[in-house]
From Swiss-Prot:
Binding site for a divalent metal cation 2: D307, H371, E406, E421
Entry's pH dependence statement: Optimum pH is 6.0.
Job of this protein: Able to cleave dimethylsulfoniopropionate (DMSP), releasing dimethyl sulfide (DMS). DMS is the principal form by which sulfur is transported from oceans to the atmosphere. The real activity of the protein is however subject to debate and it is unclear whether it constitutes a real dimethylsulfoniopropionate lyase in vivo: the low activity with DMSP as substrate suggests that DMSP is not its native substrate.
Protein name: Dimethylsulfoniopropionate lyase DddP
Stated consequence of mutating D297A: Unable to generate dimethyl sulfide (DMS) from dimethylsulfoniopropionate (DMSP)
Subunit structure: Homodimer.
Organism annotation: Roseovarius nubinhibens (strain ATCC BAA-591 / DSM 15170 / ISM)
GO molecular function: dimethylpropiothetin dethiomethylase activity; metal ion binding; protein homodimerization activity
The protein's Enzyme Commission number: 4.4.1.3
Enzyme class per UniProt: lyase
Length: 446
């Protein structure tokens, strides 16, 4: 068999040494990223690409400054999304979420060390900000059995040595999520353990210019994927024998096609299964002239979360009047609440001034008015007035924050729930709704 050079070459000569996002134009590279399909769609849409080298440096600088500002020796992270934020590297993210084998230490001088799976230390080598790759942070029972304490002692000693060298010997160490033996071992080394999530969540809350560009690209890819799902649903459901899972599978596939990574939940339901909300997507056959409601919770291109929700009426008959009213009411709810968004407004003020849903929808209203979003659902959370805890979120909004504004509108004992959600950027002067996906005109009564 003849093998042609065009089939094996590593670089596309039409693109130069780097792609438009300033990552290597190498077909065999280690780091993951958007696909050619995604790049082509973004170019057609006129979207500017992020500079990933600059984005990584921005994130690293924010983390390092956060450590210094709090007078810590460093921050030790096990959460795979905190590690993604700091290094932009991934390794079996969902498996890692319940088997924490990865750890990352950012010291007060910016020195960054990752502990990775021993067979794949190369997965972060594309990022020069990661100065060392080690292994040995897997402190869970499956991996260590009855000798977890021995591994934890060795790991904690490495952390102590690194903080002595790169954290000024400051024994105040922020930690986000850690297994029990790891915590005990760090304390035995003399560390004062500080709340790492407070540091990482507030650091991640402000998005830099390149993160915002990456999010715009991710939103476009998500909305394109949602459009494919809607097209499939409207074509297939009236023909019969199309399940919720069939529809949901389209979003998964379209996300992966564009370099997206996973979907956090299974929040797509149809007909009476939409009420109460939070029933998971399943094998139910969707009937003609029924509602479909969903929440993307999608980790998409560049690892950016796009968290939007829509409800569709699928069929040839008109939706019932009470459903149209609920849709209009939900739309009014999120749009009225969105109008409050601007720098300087505090989270308690957002709660206090929020639009009030009708009494019939109070019992099953959503768990929050708004929440932050970046690599996943993030800090802060804006609670409904009757659920707000005084003192828990006494902070103002700042430019660069991104919030999801949402509503779940369905009456107790009803046969539907409307689910709506848009993703919104806080600007210097107000807000910008990053979401452009249309609302179902039939449900809007148009």
């Amino acid at each position: 068999m003849n093998q042609h050079y065009s089939e094996t070459r590593k670089i596309d000569p039409s693109r130069g040494a780097t792609l438009g996002d300033n990552t290597p134009n190498d077909n065999n590279r280690i780091e993951i990223g958007p696909t050619q399909l995604a790049f082509g769609e973004w170019a057609t849409a006129g979207l500017a690409l992020p500079d990933l080298q600059r984005m990584r440096e921005f994130r690293w600088n924010r983390l390092t400054q956060a450590v210094v500002d709090r007078d810590y020796g460093g921050v030790l992270m096990f959460d795979p999304l905190n590690i993604r934020y700091a290094t932009d590297s991934t390794n079996m993210q969902l498996w890692n979420a319940h088997n924490p084998f990865r750890a990352l230490l950012v010291c007060a001088d910016g020195y960054m060390v990752i502990w990775d799976y021993k067979n794949s230390p190369f997965l972060s080598t594309f990022n020069p900000l990661v100065r060392e790759q080690r292994f040995g942070a897997d402190l869970f029972y499956f991996d260590r059995g009855d000798k977890v304490d021995v591994a934890a002692d060795a790991f904690s000693n490495e952390v102590r040595t690194l903080i002595a060298e790169h954290g000024g010997g400051n024994m105040r160490l922020a930690v986000d999520k850690i297994m029990l033996h790891g915590l005990r071992a760090l304390e035995a080394q003399g560390f004062e353990i500080m709340e790492g999530e407070e540091l990482t969540e507030k650091t991640r809350a402000i998005k830099g210019p390149d993160e915002i560009l990456a999010m715009r690209c991710a939103v476009h890819a998500c909305e394109t994927s949602v459009a494919a799902m809607e097209h499939f649903a409207r074509e297939a459901v009236p023909q019969g024998n199309t399940s919720e899972d069939d529809v949901w599978a389209v979003l998964h596939a379209e996300n992966i096609k564009r370099g997206g990574e996973w979907i956090e939940t299974r929040l797509l339901a149809s007909g009476p299964r939409t009420n109460p909300w939070f029933q998971e997507c399943g094998p139910r056959i969707i009937q003609n002239n029924e509602i479909i409601s969903f929440d993307t919770d999608l980790i998409g291109s560049y690892g950016i979360c796009v968290d939007i929700s829509r409800s569709w009426w699928v069929g040839d008959a008109a939706p019932p009047a009470d459903m149209v009213y609920a849709m209009q009411h939900a739309h009014e709810h999120i749009m009225t609440n969105m109008e409050m968004l601007k720098p300087g407004v505090t989270i308690p003020e957002l709660s206090e001034r929020s639009h009030r849903l009708d009494e019939q929808f109070q019992a099953q209203k959503y768990g929050c008015l708004m929440h932050g979003v970046g690599l996943c659902d993030e800090w802060p959370l804006v609670a409904y007035p009757d659920q707000a805890v005084p003192g828990s979120y006494d902070y103002p909004l700042e430019p660069g924050m991104v919030l999801c504004v949402e509503a779940a509108v369905g009456a107790v004992g009803g046969n539907f729930t409307i689910k709506l959600e848009d993703q919104v950027l806080i600007t210097e002067t107000g807000y910008e709704n990053l979401t452009s996906y249309p609302f179902d005109p039939a449900l809007m009564g148009r």
